[in-house]
Amino acid sequence: MRVGVYPGSFDPITKGHLDLIERAASKFDKVIVAVLININKKGMFSIEERVNLIEKCVAKYNNVEVKSFNGLLIDFVRKEKADVIIKGLRSVTDFEYEFQMALMNRELANEVETVFMVTSPNYSYISSSAIKQVASFSGEIKNFVPKEIVEDLEERIISLRGEG
């Protein structure tokens, strides 16, 4: 059984993330979306909320699970008995960083491979950070995030602005 782990903050999940999850789900027996708990970062959504939002988006896939983790990614991958780390690449800059991380993970666990998946061109400019910035200035975000979470994101933006 081929198990892939797709790690990230997903704050919020984007159409680019979902595209990668869908494509990975067609290539692996099981895909675990691993939501990173980063205590040094104040997210827009709590870890539990991010897991729930992603679960809404991937509910139609029988072979996709969503879990949170903290600590080393490689420890989580081993615990889940996965053999592949899935990483999305939007640019050469992404590759340079992810290549270094893949080498480090390979050194820590040579039985685990890193698979790079190139982002679909129509999503290559989308990032969670950019979406948060657009939303903070009342910009339209529905073209950037899965339809299942547009309302959740809009409600959160309103509450953060103190309008709700």
Curated annotation (Swiss-Prot):
Under which main EC class is this enzyme filed? transferase
Q: Name one GO biological process term.
A: coenzyme A biosynthetic process
Q: SUPFAM superfamilies from the xrefs?
A: Nucleotidylyl transferase
Enzyme Commission number(s) = 2.7.7.3
Checking CDD domains in the record gives: PPAT
What pathway is this protein said to act in by its record? Cofactor biosynthesis; coenzyme A biosynthesis; CoA from (R)-pantothenate: step 4/5
Instruction: Please give the catalytic activity noted in the UniProt record.
Output: (R)-4'-phosphopantetheine + ATP + H(+) = 3'-dephospho-CoA + diphosphate
Q: Which cofactor does it need?
A: Mg(2+)
> What does the subunit comment say?
Homohexamer.
Task performed by this protein: Reversibly transfers an adenylyl group from ATP to 4'-phosphopantetheine, yielding dephospho-CoA (dPCoA) and pyrophosphate.
Task: Name the chain's protein.
Answer: Phosphopantetheine adenylyltransferase
Q: Which organism is it from?
A: Clostridium perfringens (strain SM101 / Type A)
